[in-house]
Design a protein with these regions (language model features):
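Short alpha-helical segments used as structural interaction elements across diverse proteins
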Residues: 8, 51-52, 71
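Short amphipathic alpha-helical heptad-repeat segments
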Residues: 43-56
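Short, compact, well-ordered microdomains
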Residues: 57-96
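Acidic-enriched, low-complexity/disordered segments with a strong bias for Aspartate over Glutamate
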Residues: 1, 53, 89-91
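Generic secondary-structure transition motif, activating predominantly at the C-termini of alpha-helices
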Residues: 23, 27, 55-62
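Long, non-catalytic architectural segments outside compact domain cores
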Residues: 1-46, 96
């Protein structure tokens, strides 16, 4: 379950707080197409998997103190990941 994955991820509180602040201005269409070359028409699980993979790569770079690590991109990915997880959770709770 990919939504469980998000809840088990341990990241610095400052990154999570910044990502949560980003939820206020998160624009799904713009974010997915501009930053991640993802389509809103893709299955939500595909989008979530892509975001999880990208966040994992960024976190690895952060931990290795890689010179090309981009904290702003990391926050953007975390924001999208949180927003998309909430969207899936909301869809799963809607009656059929």
């Amino acid at each position: 379950d990919m939504t469980f994955h998000l809840h088990s991820v341990k990241r610095p509180k400052i990154l999570i707080n910044a990502a949560n602040l980003g939820l206020e201005t998160y624009n799904r269409a713009t974010c997915l197409s501009s930053f991640f070359a993802l389509s809103m028409h893709q299955h939500p699980a595909q989008i979530l998997r892509s975001l999880i993979d990208k966040e994992g790569q960024l976190n690895k770079m952060r931990l290795q103190q890689h010179v090309q690590y981009n904290i702003a991109l990391h926050v953007t990915v975390l924001t999208a990941l949180i927003a998309e997880t909430k969207e899936i959770d909301r869809d799963e709770k809607q009656p059929i």
